[in-house]
Design a protein with these regions (language model features):
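Intrinsically disordered, low-complexity and often Lys/Arg-enriched segments
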Residues: 1-7
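N-terminal core-binding DNA-recognition domain of tyrosine recombinases/integrases
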Residues: 11-25, 31-87
Length: 87
């Protein structure tokens, strides 16, 4: 008999976005930003991180990634949902 694992962070994050009727493309985009944020910080759990790590990530996007302000805002929105609307 196979044991069922509880859903992981990313799956729960997606499900919460979907439950709040976010568009499919928004859900996909937010998931990608969450994955990039987690990889940037060595796959640490978001509970172990906070404002400082979010700011580090956004600064990295602006300086190293040379992304536009609107792209930074999109990443910030995904992380705000993680920290304010999800956990």
């Amino acid at each position: 008999m196979a044991s069922s694992r509880p859903p992981g962070l990313i799956q729960c994050y997606r499900e919460e976005l979907q439950a709040r009727h976010y568009a499919r493309r928004t859900v996909d985009t937010y998931e990608q930003w969450l994955r990039r944020f987690l990889r940037f910080h060595g796959l640490r759990h978001p509970r172990e991180m906070g404002n400082e790590q979010v700011n580090m990530f956004l600064t990295h996007l602006a300086v190293e990634g040379q992304v536009s302000a609107s792209t930074q805002n999109q990443a910030l929105a995904a992380l705000l949902f993680l920290y304010r609307g999800f956990q």
